[in-house]
Amino acid sequence: MSVPVLRVRRLGLVGYAEALGVQGRYVRELKAGGEAGSPGGALLLCEHPAVYTVGVRRGRYPGEEEARLRGLGADFQRTDRGGLITFHGPGQLVCYPVLHLGALRRSLRSYVCGLESAVIRLCRGLGLPGERQPDTGVWVRGNKICAIGVHCARHITSHGLALNCNTDLGWFGHIVPCGIVGKGVTSLTQELGRQVTIDDIIAPFLEAFEEEFQCQLVPEQNPEQNPVQNRPDRDAGPL
């Protein structure tokens, strides 16, 4: 049985709405069957300027709440992903897998569990006790380090996960993250007691993703059309 081949594209620091547009192009490509000979999906890696996002249960966040959060200096976006409110900002690795679940031989539930497992692998490789809890995401010592919220239509996924590397956690203090009362948030930097950047984490994250989903990740093959930073060969050193 062949191993799924997925592209990796690094978008860098990009606005949330712009990243949604990029996801949409990859989703449309998969729905159309893709170009002849092209890999069947992609992982889009990025970080965002400060933005609060809410999922499909957006009724809990009226215009007054949106105005309050915008007043802090952040953007505010309403989306079609699962889950409630969360924060994205610099120092947070965001991964948007645009994949066909059939190619991965996974149900939606198994896919979400796989995202959790990949991040848990990463955390444990760093010596951190990453774990699941009844609420979706990855937790370290009772605090959420990675939020997960996905959308799936016609077996094609979008949205994904956000892993706190050296994020300013103060932004989370203005909301109830993911609607979970009484739970805190944390970051790799806070847990390890040293600065951990996105560039430090991308390579081990991609390795953990490959191991969990039994796939092959390759750099985007058209950098002139998609001017982003792609993943180097593993022997080339850290990103």
From Swiss-Prot:
Pathway involvement of the protein, from the record: Protein modification; protein lipoylation via endogenous pathway; protein N(6)-(lipoyl)lysine from octanoyl-[acyl-carrier-protein]: step 1/2
Active site: C178
Enzyme Commission number(s) from the entry: 2.3.1.181
Enzyme class: transferase
Domain BPL/LPL catalytic as annotated: residue spans: 37-217
SUPFAM superfamilies in the record: Class II aaRS and biotin synthetases
Chain positions of site Lowers pKa of active site Cys: K144
Protein's recorded name: Octanoyl-[acyl-carrier-protein]:protein N-octanoyltransferase LIPT2, mitochondrial
Species for this entry: Xenopus tropicalis (Western clawed frog)
Name of the gene this protein is made from: lipt2
